Amino acid sequence: MPAESSSTTPAIADEAPSVDMRSDTVTRPTERMYERMRQAPIGDDGLDGDPSTVELEGTVAALLGKDAGLFVPSCTMANLLAVLAAGGRSEQVVLEASAHMYMTERGAGTFTGMFYQPVAGTSGAMDLAMLEAALKPAGHRLATALVAVETSHNNAGGAVLPLDHLQAVQAIAQRRGIPVHLDGARLFNASAALRVEPAAIACFANTVSVCLSKGLSAPVGAVLAGPQPTIARARTLRRMLGGTQRQSGIMAAAGL
């Protein structure tokens, strides 16, 4: 019989630890998060409020320089609520052509009959002349209800929009009386890249969404922040979409 080979294949347990680079959505909660979740004061967010959820909403709103916040299960829902709160059937949302809200989400178009108008851009930044041309006035059959921007920009390889671009988009929209929504799922990445506070980016939008379960490594959740009347409207819409949660403070605590 042939002699057995002396070579062996190393056991998987002996291999060097691997790092999962597929997405920042695979991040795991820290031990401090687990501990805070275990100790979180809780209530019923659908009845008279959950204290940990209320604390998170206020903390994020203050961090972004906004009046109020709303905790929701995902940033997709936060973006959807921003769209629904801003407009209605047969109105238009204008956004960059490769934006996550346009390429992946598009929930408002399905649920409300709103139209998403893409504008060509470079590295996630809309061409400003094309943006201006895309805006439709009130009374038009496709009146523009909202302009949306995204930073950092997922489909542009994580590109961070310059502050002067955000300021220019805001100025164009304001001249037409149109609110701006910032899809800030990765806003804190942009904040770190630009070396500015999150509020210095959020100030160029009426409403802002931030995700807790990506780079921040919380297990679930997002916050929509903006003016009090808009967030009150979004809270009602959240219930209609089935997004109201009960002892949500267990999850919200990880974001604190």
Identify the meaning behind each predicted range.
Residues 2-256:
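Conserved PLP-enzyme active-site core in the AAT-like
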